[in-house]
């Protein structure tokens, strides 16, 4: 989006610990991101943000509060959470208004999207969101997914399966607004020699159970039976790393599987380390 000349103002609900930001690019992103929760913890800023929203339009402020209540799942706890989302939405909307933002896009359809849909209402701008799944499809009512789809200007699904699930939980009138944008890479940056016969495999991503690295390790054990000189390099880190390392050792293939950890120059490394 930035490459096309559009000004992008990054925002995040939570501020992760500084130690979690690896590499120059992530540290730069941290510095330019507006964090909603830390700002909302300042009572004066919170009151000022909602005060300005109230003065701009009492009707819209009250309508958005009613929407927050309506989008709750059953139970008192859920209502309390929705009120927190409304408070955070006021702070985010104030930031968007001061920066003259014309469209709000949110990543994922769960709690952060609950804040986004309310902030968009307060700021009187359209919003959209990207959904990966699959976890949210098990908690559709909790996250008011049909309401969010109905109110969104468009919804991005990362796969045909994801789009089908979004269609399942939305009114057919809104199906046309659900589009597919795959999580891909720039093909020109990752060209390889199609005539090569290398046996080096690379995985790049967060080591989390949903990413499927464990399946790749299982498959590698089968590959090594026919190609004992094959290797697998996993670039990335995460909660599933210890289990993946243990599984590689249990399969007896730990010498063929390398865990590279977090990397910043993945492309340069894998141009010489994979096929």
Q: What do the predicted segments below correspond to?
A:
Residues 2, 77, 127-153:
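A conserved, positively charged/aromatic
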Residues 194-222, 233:
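Conserved donor-binding/catalytic core segment of Leloir-type glycosyltransferases
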């Amino acid at each position: 989006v930035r490459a096309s000349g559009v000004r992008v103002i990054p925002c995040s609900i939570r501020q992760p610990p500084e130690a979690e930001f690896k590499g120059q690019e992530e540290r730069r992103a941290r510095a330019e991101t507006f964090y909603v929760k830390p700002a909302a913890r300042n009572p004066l800023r919170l009151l000022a943000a909602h005060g300005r929203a109230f003065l701009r339009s009492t009707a819209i402020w009250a309508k958005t509060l009613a929407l927050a209540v309506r989008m709750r799942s059953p139970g008192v706890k859920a209502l309390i959470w929705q009120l927190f989302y409304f408070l955070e939405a006021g702070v985010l909307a104030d930031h968007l208004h001061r920066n003259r933002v014309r469209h709000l896009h949110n990543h994922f359809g769960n709690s952060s999207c609950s804040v986004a849909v309310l902030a968009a209402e307060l700021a009187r701008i359209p919003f959209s969101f990207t959904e990966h799944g699959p976890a949210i499809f098990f908690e559709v009512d909790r996250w008011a997914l049909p309401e969010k789809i109905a109110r969104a200007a468009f919804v991005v699904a990362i796969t045909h399966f994801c789009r089908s699930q979004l269609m399942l939980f939305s009114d057919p009138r809104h199906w046309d607004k659900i589009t597919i944008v795959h999580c891909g890479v720039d093909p020109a940056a990752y060209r390889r020699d199609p005539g090569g016969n290398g046996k080096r495999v690379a995985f790049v991503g967060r080591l989390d159970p949903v990413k499927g690295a464990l399946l790749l390790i299982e498959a590698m054990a089968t590959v090594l039976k026919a190609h004992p000189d094959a290797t697998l390099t996993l670039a990335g880190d995460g909660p599933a790393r210890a289990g993946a390392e243990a599984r590689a050792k249990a399969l007896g293939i730990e010498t063929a599987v390398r865990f590279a950890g977090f990397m910043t120059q993945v492309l340069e490394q894998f141009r010489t380390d994979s096929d």
